[in-house]
C-alpha cells in the first residue's frame, strides 16, 4: 500500500493541462467496438486500470484488441460472435465493466463467471441482475444475485419496459445493451436523467435510439457498425484541477479538451453558482461528445445548496465539491446523494471522516453532507481506502493544508488518472 506525501503549494498552480480520456466513454468504445461489425479505432482512450479491465475481459471472449497508449484498435465480432471465456472474467475495481458487460452477456448463448476485487464484492448488483432476469437471462450470485461473483448464461430475451428506482447510467446501459438482441422494444425510465454516453455512442454505431423525456427506447435486432471514436478529456478528472484552480491562492489553470456532455457538467454549474472565476471555450461544436478548453483562477467561493436533478450530473464530483465547500464562505448542503453510499467506498462517510482529519467542519446524515466554511485545513495522515476519487480529492486538500499531508493507499488514483500526481507536481513548480 503506497503512500504519497503532499506539501503545501505556496505559489499556486499554474499552466496548461491536457485532461486524460473520459473513463465512461473509453469503456463503451471498447465494448461497442467488440460487438460491432468491422474495425473500430479509438483515440484518446484512457489507459487506466478500470478501462484496461474492460479490454482484458473482451480479449478473454475472443475479441482482437490492440492497445498502444491512448490509441486502441478493436476488431469487432458482432453481437453473436463473442466466445465463451475459458477463465473467470475479472473486472478489477470497475463497476462500469461488470454492469455494462452483464447486459451484453445476458444475450450470449454461453456461461460466464464475472468477479472483481473486494470493493466490487460489496457493491449492489441486483439493480442490474433483476431487470436482466426479467428479460430472460439466467443469472446467479451471492445472496440471489445481489453480490459478485456472478454467473451469467444468456437466453432468448424479451424486451421490457423498466422503471428504474435510481438514476443510474450503468443500470440503464445494461438493460439497453441486453435489449439489442431482445424481442420487441426495450424501454428504461429513470427518476432523473443520468449520463447519456451509451445513447450517444449507440447512435454513432448506427443503432436507432428514441429518447422521450426520462425514457430511452430501442428496438431489438439492430446491429452495430464499427466507427472511429475520439474520446474527449474526462470532466470527472478535470474536476480536481478545476477545484484546485479555484481554491489554491495565486493559481491560474487552462484545462484542455474537457468533455462537456450536458449530462456530466453539473460541476461547471456548481462552481459558477459558488462564484468561481472561469471561462469555457468550446472546441468541437457539433461532435457527438462536445469538448471545451476551460480557464480557471483563484476565486472567492460562497456556500450553496446542491440537490435534486443535478445530482446524477455530478455524482462522481461530490467529494471534490465538498472540499471546495470547506473553502467557501457560509454553509454548503449537498443532499439527495444516497448513491454515494454504494460507490468504491461509502463516499459520504469517507469524505466526512478524511476531511475532518484535516480540520474541516463537516457533518453527514443519511443522504447528505453539511459543510461549514471557511476552514483552515491542517496536514495529517489520511486514507483513500482504495477509492481513486477520494485519493485525488485528498491530494488537492493537502495543497492548501498547513504542513504535510500523507495519503495512504494513494496508488488508487491509477484507476482513472495514472499521471495525476506527476501533473500536480508539474503545475506546482
UniProtKB/Swiss-Prot annotation:
<comment type="pathway">
    <text>Metabolic intermediate biosynthesis; chorismate biosynthesis; chorismate from D-erythrose 4-phosphate and phosphoenolpyruvate: step 6/7.</text>
</comment>
<feature type="binding site">
    <location>
        <position position="95"/>
    </location>
    <ligand>
        <name>phosphoenolpyruvate</name>
    </ligand>
</feature>
<feature type="binding site">
    <location>
        <position position="170"/>
    </location>
    <ligand>
        <name>3-phosphoshikimate</name>
    </ligand>
</feature>
<keyword id="KW-0057">Aromatic amino acid biosynthesis</keyword>
<feature type="binding site">
    <location>
        <position position="23"/>
    </location>
    <ligand>
        <name>phosphoenolpyruvate</name>
    </ligand>
</feature>
<feature type="binding site">
    <location>
        <position position="28"/>
    </location>
    <ligand>
        <name>3-phosphoshikimate</name>
    </ligand>
</feature>
<dbReference type="GO" id="GO:0009073">
    <property type="term" value="P:aromatic amino acid family biosynthetic process"/>
</dbReference>
<dbReference type="GO" id="GO:0008652">
    <property type="term" value="P:amino acid biosynthetic process"/>
</dbReference>
<feature type="binding site">
    <location>
        <position position="389"/>
    </location>
    <ligand>
        <name>phosphoenolpyruvate</name>
    </ligand>
</feature>
<feature type="binding site">
    <location>
        <position position="316"/>
    </location>
    <ligand>
        <name>3-phosphoshikimate</name>
    </ligand>
</feature>
<protein>
    <recommendedName>
        <fullName>3-phosphoshikimate 1-carboxyvinyltransferase</fullName>
        <ecNumber>2.5.1.19</ecNumber>
    </recommendedName>
</protein>
<dbReference type="Pfam" id="PF00275">
    <property type="entry name" value="EPSP_synthase"/>
</dbReference>
<feature type="binding site">
    <location>
        <position position="123"/>
    </location>
    <ligand>
        <name>phosphoenolpyruvate</name>
    </ligand>
</feature>
<comment type="similarity">
    <text>Belongs to the EPSP synthase family.</text>
</comment>
<feature type="binding site">
    <location>
        <position position="23"/>
    </location>
    <ligand>
        <name>3-phosphoshikimate</name>
    </ligand>
</feature>
<feature type="binding site">
    <location>
        <position position="168"/>
    </location>
    <ligand>
        <name>3-phosphoshikimate</name>
    </ligand>
</feature>
<dbReference type="GO" id="GO:0009423">
    <property type="term" value="P:chorismate biosynthetic process"/>
</dbReference>
<feature type="binding site">
    <location>
        <position position="343"/>
    </location>
    <ligand>
        <name>3-phosphoshikimate</name>
    </ligand>
</feature>
<feature type="binding site">
    <location>
        <position position="347"/>
    </location>
    <ligand>
        <name>phosphoenolpyruvate</name>
    </ligand>
</feature>
<comment type="subunit">
    <text>Monomer.</text>
</comment>
<dbReference type="GO" id="GO:0005737">
    <property type="term" value="C:cytoplasm"/>
</dbReference>
<dbReference type="InterPro" id="IPR006264">
    <property type="entry name" value="EPSP_synthase"/>
</dbReference>
<dbReference type="GO" id="GO:0003866">
    <property type="term" value="F:3-phosphoshikimate 1-carboxyvinyltransferase activity"/>
</dbReference>
<dbReference type="InterPro" id="IPR023193">
    <property type="entry name" value="EPSP_synthase_CS"/>
</dbReference>
<keyword id="KW-0808">Transferase</keyword>
<feature type="binding site">
    <location>
        <position position="24"/>
    </location>
    <ligand>
        <name>3-phosphoshikimate</name>
    </ligand>
</feature>
<feature type="binding site">
    <location>
        <position position="170"/>
    </location>
    <ligand>
        <name>phosphoenolpyruvate</name>
    </ligand>
</feature>
<keyword id="KW-0963">Cytoplasm</keyword>
<keyword id="KW-0028">Amino-acid biosynthesis</keyword>
<dbReference type="InterPro" id="IPR001986">
    <property type="entry name" value="Enolpyruvate_Tfrase_dom"/>
</dbReference>
<dbReference type="InterPro" id="IPR036968">
    <property type="entry name" value="Enolpyruvate_Tfrase_sf"/>
</dbReference>
<feature type="active site" description="Proton acceptor">
    <location>
        <position position="316"/>
    </location>
</feature>
<comment type="function">
    <text>Catalyzes the transfer of the enolpyruvyl moiety of phosphoenolpyruvate (PEP) to the 5-hydroxyl of shikimate-3-phosphate (S3P) to produce enolpyruvyl shikimate-3-phosphate and inorganic phosphate.</text>
</comment>
<dbReference type="InterPro" id="IPR013792">
    <property type="entry name" value="RNA3'P_cycl/enolpyr_Trfase_a/b"/>
</dbReference>
Amino acid at each position: 500500500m503506497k503512500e504519497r506525501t503532499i506539501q503545501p503549494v505556496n505559489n499556486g498552480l499554474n499552466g496548461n493541462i491536457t485532461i486524460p480520456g473520459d473513463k465512461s466513454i473509453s469503456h463503451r468504445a471498447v465494448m461497442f467496438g467488440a460487438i460491432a461489425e468491422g474495425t473500430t479505432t479509438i483515440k484518446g482512450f484512457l489507459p487506466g486500470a478500470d478501462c484496461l479491465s474492460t479490454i482484458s475481459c473482451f480479449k478473454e471472449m475472443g475479441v482482437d484488441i490492440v492497445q498502444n497508449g491512448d490509441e486502441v484498435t478493436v476488431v469487432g465480432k458482432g453481437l453473436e460472435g463473442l466466445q465463451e471465456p475459458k477463465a473467470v472474467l475479472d473486472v478489477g475495481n470497475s463497476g462500469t465493466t461488470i454492469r455494462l458487460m452483464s447486459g451484453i452477456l445476458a444475450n450470449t448463448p454461453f456461461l460466464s463467471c464475472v468477479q472483481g476485487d473486494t470493493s466490487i464484492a460489496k457493491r449492489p448488483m441486483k439493480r442490474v441482475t433483476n431487470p436482466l432476469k426479467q428479460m430472460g437471462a439466467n443469472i446467479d450470485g451471492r445472496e440471489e444475485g445481489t453480490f459478485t461473483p456472478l454467473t451469467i448464461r444468456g437466453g432468448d430475451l424479451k424486451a421490457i419496459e423498466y422503471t428504474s428506482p435510481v438514476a443510474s447510467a450503468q443500470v440503464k446501459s445494461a438493460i439497453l445493451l441486453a435489449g439489442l438482441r431482445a424481442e420487441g422494444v426495450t424501454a428504461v425510465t429513470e427518476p432523473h436523467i443520468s449520463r447519456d454516453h451509451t445513447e450517444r455512442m449507440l447512435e454513432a454505431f448506427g443503432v436507432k435510439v428514441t429518447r422521450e423525456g426520462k425514457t430511452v427506447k430501442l428496438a431489438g435486432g439492430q446491429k452495430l457498425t464499427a466507427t472511429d471514436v475520439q474520446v474527449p478529456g474526462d470532466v470527472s478528472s478535470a474536476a480536481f484541477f478545476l477545484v484546485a484552480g479555484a481554491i489554491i491562492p495565486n493559481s491560474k489553470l487552462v484545462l484542455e479538451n474537457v468533455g462537456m456532455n450536458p449530462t456530466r457538467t453539473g460541476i461547471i454549474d456548481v462552481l459558477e453558482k459558488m462564484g468561481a472565476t472561469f471561462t469555457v471555450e468550446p472546441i468541437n461544436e457539433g461532435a457527438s461528445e462536445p469538448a471545451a478548453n476551460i480557464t480557471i483562477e483563484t476565486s472567492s467561493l460562497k456556500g450553496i445548496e446542491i440537490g435534486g436533478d443535478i445530482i446524477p450530473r455530478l455524482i462522481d464530483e461530490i467529494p471534490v465539491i465538498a472540499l471546495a465547500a470547506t473553502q467557501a464562505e457560509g454553509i454548503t448542503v449537498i443532499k439527495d446523494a444516497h448513491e454515494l453510499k454504494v460507490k468504491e467506498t461509502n463516499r459520504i462517510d469517507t469524505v466526512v471522516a478524511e476531511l475532518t482529519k484535516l480540520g474541516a467542519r463537516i457533518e453527514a446524515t443519511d443522504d447528505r453532507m453539511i459543510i461549514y466554511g471557511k476552514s483552515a485545513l491542517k496536514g495529517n495522515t489520511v486514507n483513500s481506502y482504495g477509492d481513486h476519487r477520494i485519493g485525488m480529492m485528498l491530494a488537492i486538500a493537502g495543497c492548501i493544508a498547513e504542513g504535510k499531508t500523507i495519503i495512504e493507499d494513494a496508488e488508487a488514483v491509477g484507476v482513472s488518472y495514472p499521471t495525476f500526481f506527476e501533473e500536480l507536481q508539474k503545475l506546482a513548480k
